[in-house]
Amino acid sequence: MKTGAQVWRALAKSCLLCAALGCLHLPGARGEKPDFFETNAVNGSLVRSRPVRSVDVTPAPTDCQLSTWSSWTACDPCQKKRYRHTYLLRPSQFYGELCDFSDKEVEDCVTNRACRSQVRCEGFVCAQTGRCVNRRLLCNGDNDCGDQSDEANCRRIYKKCSQDMEQYWAIGNLASGINLFTNTFEGPVLDHRYYAGACSPHYILNTNFRKPYNVESYTPQTQGKYEFALTEYESYFDFEHNVTEKATSKSSFKFGFKLDGLVEFGVRKESNEGRHYISRTKRFSHTKSKFLHARSVLEVAHYKLKSRQLMLHYEFLQRVKSLPLEYSYGEYRDLLRDFGTHFITEAVLGGIYEYTLIMNKDAMERGDYTLDHVSACAGGGFQIGGNVYKVYLKLGVSEKKCSDILNEIKDRNKRRTMVEDLVVLVRGGTSEYITSLAYKDLPTAELMKEWGDAVQYNPAIIKLKAEPLYELVTATDFAYSSTVKQNMKKALEEFQMEVSSCRCAPCRNNGVPILKESRCECICPAGFQGVACEVTNRKDIPIDGKWSCWSDWSPCSGGRKTRQRQCNNPAPQRGGSPCSGPASETLDC
């Protein structure tokens, strides 16, 4: 029987043969539409012609490679188990063999060492979760234990809350761990269904909410006007640095993996939205295009967590208690995979609606248009309902120019225009209906109101402040908390290196590599296909530089340590852009 990788290799060979015979087309060559990366652009130079050959040879498959097994740990006295692990040396890529087997092993063992894992509880010890709760919480109608054992064998229930109340919007994600290396929400780490017997009603928009014990504040924000901030970019390089990288980038950390202040929570590159946005905009790198970016931010609530004595979710509590005291990366890595790298301490809830008009520079010059004209008409048309005559009076743009610009935006799918594409990214309040309208045209006042109403009841976390997960490990809940905390810190450093996409080989033609578990994939700019983005009809395009992985930190010397990286993954070619950011870092130690 063939393995999955062998099937992929056979498929890759078939595709190459098909390309050689001229039977492989890009989406749109004969009216075909790809599943998700459908483009609204009608640019003759990029879309109308079809590829007849592969410019680059498909890279050879790269097989996944794991390290050799670590030594077995000593037998853990509390778990009566010992552990060993491997780690990822090289991810699979280009249909290479996958690492589809376990990267850790656990086996039972015997030891004479005593286990002292219990933390003294002055209250009631919950039967299954092991949580310690105050005895005054017994028989109060709430599931304070998480396993209902505090409500068992009650002669009478003394309910504090006489009426049902709702949970705060987005409270599930706020209680979850978050992997800030991948921008994903993981398992629950805080119990925001625990109220410590309190019944504190909180009315927001005529809805009665019950405030969880862990939450210090959840403050609604007054819904303001839907105003777009418009920014003009004369080149793709400026647009990518100021817009795309911020919308899809991962968080950067100071020493200790702490975030400084509130930071914007970006869209995952691996998500449908992230792939779509990157593919649609990156196709215009190194073209004569100008970019008009519009952005509207709607804040509906501010959230803040208590600073101490938090009630942990019982699933997270039990997982941390089951960790071995002797460091084993495999076990601690699994904790980070399942519960994330950080937890949220503050957040701004709401939505972000942004769109980008991509304009053909030559066509604009022929028609005597500037980005100021486009900005005035696109922004003004939304603000006053699209009345072109009023835009003409208010902004000093001729009525004909505004009318022509708005018509070209509307008709960009039907004919070749100076408007090459309209790319939309919506966070918060999204629905299929709203998204389908957003992708078709510039936002109207009616659409924005509909979106704003949806954001109110389905907000996204658009900004956050977070602390590393190990900060939840305290002596209140865990014996040997300092040992476990140090182990989690060490695992976090190793985990960051293991999951970084810098470990992927470069994609061709400015494709964006992403690492998913032990496999690398390429997000291709629209107009490029293939496992490495190697299939295209465009020739000799400039290749932008990308960073290699950071080196290990140097030994601490004079209270300082350093690390380096190189702009060679790939290096800039044919006039491509250099890597942005520093090539070295220095920290106190």
UniProtKB/Swiss-Prot annotation:
Residue ranges constituting the TSP type-1 domain according to the UniProt record: 63-116, 544-587
Description of how activity is regulated: Membrane attack complex (MAC) assembly is inhibited by CD59, thereby protecting self-cells from damage during complement activation. CD59 acts by binding to the beta-haipins of C8 (C8A and C8B), forming an intermolecular beta-sheet that prevents incorporation of the multiple copies of C9 required for complete formation of the osmolytic pore. MAC assembly is also inhibited by clusterin (CLU) chaperones that inhibit polymerization of C9.
Residue positions assigned to the propeptide: 32-53
Record keywords: Calcium, Complement alternate pathway, Complement pathway, Cytolysis, Disulfide bond, EGF-like domain, Glycoprotein, Immunity, Innate immunity, Membrane, Membrane attack complex, Metal-binding, Phosphoprotein, Repeat, Secreted, Signal, Target cell membrane, Target membrane, Transmembrane, Transmembrane beta strand
Spans through the membrane: 251-258, 261-268, 378-385, 391-398
Modified residues (Phosphothreonine): 417
Record's protein name: Complement component C8 beta chain
Source species: Rattus norvegicus
